[in-house]
Regions:
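Short Gly/aromatic-enriched secondary-structure transition segments
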Residues: 29, 33-56, 314-334, 460-471
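Non-transmembrane alpha-helical segments in soluble domains
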Residues: 101, 164-167, 171, 197, ...
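Short, solvent-exposed turn/loop segments enriched in Gly/Ser/Thr/Pro and often Arg
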Residues: 138-140, 190-191, 386-391, 458-468
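Acidic/polar loop patches that form or flank catalytic/metal-binding clefts of enzymes
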Residues: 244-245, 380-386, 452-457
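A structural signal for well-ordered alpha-helical segments within the folded catalytic domains
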Residues: 32, 82-85, 161-168, 194, ...
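Non-catalytic accessory segments of hydrolases
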Residues: 2-158, 181, 269, 421-439, ...
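Serine-hydrolase-like catalytic core of hydrolytic proteins
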Residues: 74-244, 261, 290-313
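Substrate-gating cap/lid region and adjacent catalytic-acid/histidine neighborhood
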Residues: 211, 254-430, 442, 449
Length: 507
């Protein structure tokens, strides 16, 4: 790291030089932070619905404040605008060629930001001598919907192009911040995990990555081109417009504010925004590409939580995710006999109050992840993990080890307001720190060596399960895995986007 520090004591400025630009950040408790670094030009005006562009070179970038988030629903109370393609870096003072964690946030492709406190890299970098990078990418209408039917002015999958650009910037600059460009691990959760499942299949991205961590991603969460364009046409109808000029004239704020309302209009909830197989950027569904061994054979660590979809027991969240539609599309093509058998085996395997939660969790998230791992493990090494721990309050609320509950453990961030309420009392706080250190050490080991000290994905699908006690057991019972393999859902998930007009996804 070519540093020019005033001091390494808390909250003092620190500077590095990369590609003839000075980056001014902050140093606190031995960890240096650079926030809001632009990796591409603003996407406002002429940049809207177009590929990201390399930013103009400047003499200095003051990187001591997080940059704007991408336009989205107003519930996210941070600055938001179209000049949102920025990233954040955490590295130990004096770091040199350390493994790099490139983290992609989730949010159903319509919300979220790399500056979320849960992804703050301070604690993780202090605990494990790695470099952490978090990014913003375009979301929802601006980043996902395909308006290319309006003309060449409109590019599909801008969100994916943004991630590829951020990866390229990281590869080209991270050595000057203390990272090793030849050892970049991409990690993402939920929608971010879905993107990570795609990246090894994209030559534009795969050239920069050496390992990947998929946390509760859905590798079936992709549309065909025609479906993506139908959704874009539905958005124009929803907004009461019919031309490219009208679409380009809508303010970013109005587009962001419409993001959530549009999901109610479509009645698809969280499935209203999904990347699509356009033939140029995304060649096919990730499951199909991996099955055909058309991906970079890198080590993979794939994980999930014990009770992924438990929060959907809350009606407001069930409506937001479009749970009724998810369930309908996940089972409507199955025979009545098979549906009955699947429900029966869940009732026999789990407690009465837990059976439906586990069924939803497997259908929406865990079954597609296991199918992806099955195919990838034919040509590369794959490991599993599962987050099983839940606090007394989480159990009382019925959310248990819910979707994304593993993230504070990876990053070591248990004290910010959104999570603090879950961990009460000295004993629980001690437990979460112990589990956090375990999962952080495993992450650092994986990033450094590309291996983990338990068996790879096999017929038994053994994973490391983080709870009050560490266990190694099947991620999903074999009997349940076998039933899911019999489904039409499984069959159509492996049909190329170019062979069928049907959606190869559970959404």
């Amino acid at each position: 790291m070519a540093v020019k520090p005033l001091s390494s004591t808390p909250s003092h400025p620190i500077q590095i030089i990369s590609h003839d630009t000075v980056y001014s950040g902050c140093s606190e408790k031995g960890v240096c932070t650079w926030k809001g670094i632009p990796y591409a030009k603003s996407t406002a005006g002429e940049g809207r619905f177009r590929p990201p562009q390399i930013p103009e070179k400047v003499d200095e970038i003051v990187a001591d404040q997080f940059g704007p988030a991408c336009p989205q629903h107003k519930h996210l109370n941070v600055p938001k605008n179209e000049n949102c393609l920025n990233l954040n870096i955490w590295a130990r003072f004096g770091a040199k060629r350390r493994p790099v964690l490139f983290y992609i946030h989730g949010g159903s492709f319509m919300s979220g930001t790399g500056s979320d406190p849960v992804f703050d890299g301070q604690e993780l970098v202090a605990a494990e001598n790695i470099v952490v990078v978090t990014i913003n990418y375009r979301l929802g209408v601006l980043g996902i919907l395909d308006f290319s039917f309006l003309g060449d002015r409109f590019t599909p999958n801008c969100a994916i192009l943004d991630v590829c650009m951020a990866l390229r910037w990281t590869y080209e600059h991270i050595a000057d911040f203390g990272g090793n460009p030849d050892n970049i691990t991409v990690m993402g959760e939920s929608a971010g995990g879905s993107i990570v499942s795609l990246l090894p299949t994209l030559p534009e991205a795969a050239q920069y990555i050496s390992k990947c961590v998929i946390s509760s991603g859905v590798p079936t969460e992709f549309w065909t081109k025609s479906q993506a364009q139908q959704m874009a046409q539905a958005y124009m109808k929803f907004m009461g417009i019919s031309s490219a000029e009208e679409l380009l004239a809508i303010s970013a704020e109005r587009i962001g504010d419409s993001t959530q309302d549009f999901t109610q209009y479509t009645k698809l909830g969280a499935a209203s925004y999904e990347p699509s197989v356009d033939g140029k950027i995304i060649r096919d569904f990730p499951l199909v590409s991996v099955q055909q061994a058309e991906f970079k054979k890198i080590p993979m660590w794939i994980g999930m939580t014990r009770d992924e979809m438990s929060f959907l027991t809350f009606s407001i969240l069930s409506r937001r995710w479009g749970l009724a539609k998810l369930m309908e599309e996940g089972t409507d093509e199955e025979s009545a006999a098979l549906r009955e058998k699947i429900i029966k085996i869940y009732d026999e395997t789990y407690d009465k109050d837990d059976a439906r939660i586990q069924l939803y969790s497997d259908m929406v998230i865990r079954a597609p992840l296991i199918w992806y791992a099955e195919e990838a493990s034919q040509t590369t090494h794959v490991w599993f993990y599962r987050m099983d721990w839940s606090s007394r309050i989480m159990d009382k609320l019925g959310i248990k080890a819910f979707h994304s509950s593993d993230l504070p453990f990876f990053f070591g961030n248990f004290n910010f307001p959104a999570n603090r309420i879950y961990y009460q009392g000295k004993e629980e706080k001690k437990i979460v720190k112990t589990i956090g250190r375990s999962i952080q050490r495993d992450l650092a080991t994986f990033m450094d060596s590309g291996t983990l000290p338990w068996e790879t994905a096999s017929e038994r699908f053994i994973g490391k399960c983080y709870g009050d006690e560490i266990r190694y057991e099947e991620i999903m019972p074999k009997e349940i895995r076998d039933y899911w393999r019999q489904t039409t859902y499984h069959e159509r998930s492996f049909i190329s986007a170019w062979q069928s007009n049907n959606k190869g996804t559970n959404q």
